[in-house]
Amino acid sequence: MRHSLTKLLAASGSNSPTRSESPEPAATCSLPSDLTRAAAGEEETAAAGSPGRKQQFGDEGELEAGRGSRGGVAVRAPSPEEMEEEAIASLPGEETEDMDFLSGLELADLLDPRQPDWHLDPGLSSPGPLSSSGGGSDSGGLWRGDDDDEAAAAEMQRFSDLLQRLLNGIGGCSSSSDSGSAEKRRRKSPGGGGGGGSGNDNNQAATKSPRKAAAAAARLNRLKKKEYVMGLESRVRGLAAENQELRAENRELGKRVQALQEESRYLRAVLANETGLARLLSRLSGVGLRLTTSLFRDSPAGDHDYALPVGKQKQDLLEEDDSAGGVCLHVDKDKVSVEFCSACARKASSSLKM
């Protein structure tokens, strides 16, 4: 009701010019007698409905009563200074009334305005949204309508949203500070003892174990490759030495094959000249010469027999008086040749000593 009266006074003051704005005398407005009576009745009703407001609105009631008694007397509109003083004087009563109103409420009721469960004392009147049909004091029902109910509900909704955001902000700050402190503790004590610390260590070990396994496998592969390469190198060195030996043996075998080919050609020629050699040898035997040969004897180590592998020939130191002086008689078909051959001479002398 106080707000409604303030609005009426402000409207009347805006319609009438003040003394400071114009030098003319203040305009007079004659209020009807029925309007003054209604205002006085409303004052009395408000005083009876809310006893806490009797003292605050006593002066206003007297002012309205004086206006009603004078009737057509000129009424001066309140100045802005008087309105401010009146608003300041009314603040303590509103604060105590708001505190009385909030004393019977819980936090959950404030946070859920759509389903209110407010249990107020019988003597307290709620300054919340009131409908014109009923609820609250009679003065509130007279002066407030559906628009005021919707505005009050919107204000209460905003108030509950603000409280919810404040609570969420406090909870978020506390949770973030707790998480930050826990993270700092874990960083300061990496091996520190706690359930979370041990779980973190287990997670770190689980993430590091595949890396360690991969590094160990790579190192093992490198060692295996190195060992394999070293084995190949040693095998190559051994095969190179063996190859050299085989090459030397191949050369020796090549020489032996060549000697065998020459000997085979020589023996084929002897067999081809068998008849002439047989007649010559028969005549020599008739002359009284003894025929000898080294064909059926084992050749000595220094023999140059081409059918046998050639070894290191040892030079036999022969005495001067034992030196052989024989000659080689070569019969080739119809031709007979005498050759001087030391090897044949040694064979001949060795056969004579038998």
From Swiss-Prot:
The primary site where this protein sits is nucleus
Q: Where is this region: Leucine-zipper?
A: 232-267
**Basic motif as annotated region, ranges:** 219-226
Where Phosphoserine occurs, the residues are S50
Q: Where is the bZIP domain?
A: 204-267
Q: Which domain of life is it from?
A: Eukaryota
Q: Where is the composition biased (Low complexity)?
A: 121-132, 205-214
Give the motif span (HCFC1-binding motif (HBM)): 303-306
Q: Which GO terms describe its cellular component?
A: chromatin; mitochondrion; nucleoplasm; nucleus; RNA polymerase II transcription regulator complex
Where does the record place the region Disordered? Answer: 1-95, 113-156, 171-214
| UniProt subcellular location | Nucleus
InterPro entries given in the database record: bZIP, bZIP_sf
Q: Name one GO molecular function term.
A: DNA binding
Alphabetical keyword list: Nucleus, Phosphoprotein, Transcription, Transcription regulation
Q: Which body tissues produce this protein?
A: In adults, expressed most abundantly in heart, liver and skeletal muscle, moderately abundant in kidney and pancreas, and barely detectable in lung. In fetal tissues, expressed most abundantly in kidney and very low amounts in heart, lung and liver.
Mention one GO biological process in which this protein takes part, according to its record. positive regulation of transcription by RNA polymerase II
Composition bias of kind Gly residues appears in 133-143, 190-199
What biological function has been recorded for the protein in this entry?
A: Strongly activates transcription when bound to HCFC1. Suppresses the expression of HSV proteins in cells infected with the virus in a HCFC1-dependent manner. Also suppresses the HCFC1-dependent transcriptional activation by CREB3 and reduces the amount of CREB3 in the cell. Able to down-regulate expression of some cellular genes in CREBZF-expressing cells.
Q: Please tell me what else the database record remarks about this protein.
A: Named 'Zhangfei' after a legendary Chinese warrior who was contemporary with Luman in around 220 AD.
Subunit record text: Interacts with HCFC1; the interaction inhibits CREB3 transcriptional activity. Interacts with CREB3; the interaction occurs only in combination with HCFC1.
Q: Which family does it belong to?
A: Belongs to the bZIP family. ATF subfamily.
List the protein's name: CREB/ATF bZIP transcription factor
What lineage does UniProt assign to this protein's organism? Eukaryota, Metazoa, Chordata, Craniata, Vertebrata
